[in-house]
Regions:
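Metallo-beta-lactamase
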Residues: 2-3, 94-152, 159-160, 252, ...
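Conserved beta-strand hairpin/beta-sheet module of binuclear metal-dependent hydrolase folds
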Residues: 2-57, 151-168, 184
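Active-site neighborhood of phospho(di)ester-bond hydrolases with catalytic His/Asp-centered motifs
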Residues: 42-46, 66-76, 102, 164-170, ...
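Short beta->alpha connector loops
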Residues: 47-48, 105, 146-149, 168-173
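Active-site metal-binding motif and surrounding structural segment of the metallo-beta-lactamase
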Residues: 48-98, 181-184
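Metal-dependent catalytic neighborhoods of phosphoester/phosphodiester hydrolases
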Residues: 79-88, 112, 227-236
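Short helix-capping segments at alpha-helix termini
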Residues: 90-94, 116-120, 239-245
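Binuclear metal-ion centers of metallo-dependent hydrolases, dominated by the metallo-beta-lactamase
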Residues: 130, 175-184, 191-266
Length: 266
């Protein structure tokens, strides 16, 4: 049963990325809680997801989740996935929920999802490039494999009147704009300036926002260079350079997406 007062919203259980930021918890790393059209799910439960959720002032109950989505197996995105499966299923006493994850998070010599927990779930779905999926009232796709170590996907979610994209870790490539165009776009931007890392930096994010023209862009998953530059200042400068509304995620921040919903399908 979905709560009657649910609105379209997202809550950032963390806004940090990169190894030093996560290891020192300079910014939290718990992922993103989504509620779209009454369907609640968690994306990328990194270290501290369960603690951040249960301590949140936003009344987040893991037993109300319908699913967990992993963009990839790296610990800053999947470190708390097993704890969250336990919490979602009440320690395995209620078999429920769906886990969506790339194949290398589930199989091979070093999977990040413990095998003994898998029977707690109703479904486990392996993500594929170009794949389309459903969870509750939400349709979503993994439009393209990202250019990052391992098997990495982003998500484009659609409910009636609203589309939301999450662009997970990747090096920049121009086709991202076409694949992830949406009303609201969340972009993982780790670096302030160009580097050899396979992560997006601010000038590339500016180019991407210009091409996509979302109604709202949210930058998150910050490394130290952006944190030192103050993410809210970086976001304001991006707004000025792109002509689009750009804001910076912060730990515990809730965004009401209802103002971005229109009358037609996403």
């Amino acid at each position: 049963m979905k709560p009657a007062n649910v609105t379209d919203r997202i809550v950032f259980l963390g806004s940090g990325g990169a190894r030093i930021v996560v290891a020192r918890q300079i910014r939290a790393s718990g992922g993103i809680w989504f509620c779209l059209d009454g369907t609640m799910f968690l994306v990328d439960p990194g270290p501290g997801a369960l603690v951040r959720m249960t301590a949140s002032r936003h009344d987040l109950n893991p037993a109300e989740l319908e699913g967990i989505l992993l963009s990839h197996r790296h610990l800053d995105h999947a470190g708390d996935v097993n704890n969250m499966i336990e919490a979602m299923t009440m320690g395995g006493t209620e078999r429920r929920g769906t886990l969506f994850a790339p194949s290398d998070a589930l199989e091979g010599d070093d999977p990040v999802v413990l095998r003994y927990l898998r029977g707690f779930l109703e479904r486990i779905v392996t993500l594929e490039p170009g794949g389309s999926y459903e969870l509750g009232g939400v349709r979503f796709a993994c439009p393209v494999r990202h250019r990052h170590r391992g098997e990495v996907y982003g998500f484009r979610f659609v409910v009636p009147g609203l589309s939301v994209s999450y662009i997970a870790d990747t090096s920049y490539f121009p086709e991202l704009a076409e694949h992830y165009r949406a009303d609201v776009v969340i972009i993982n931007v780790v670096r302030l300036e160009q580097s050899e890392l396979d992560h997006m930096h601010v000038p590339e994010a500016i180019e991407l926002v210009r091409a996509m023209k979302p109604r709202l862009a949210v930058i998150s998953h910050f490394g130290m260079t952006i944190i030192r530059a103050r993410p809210w200042v970086v976001a304001q400068e991006m707004s000025e350079q792109t002509g689009c509304k750009v804001i910076a995620a912060s730990d515990g921040r809730e965004l009401d997406l209802s103002e971005y919903r229109t009358g037609g399908p996403g």
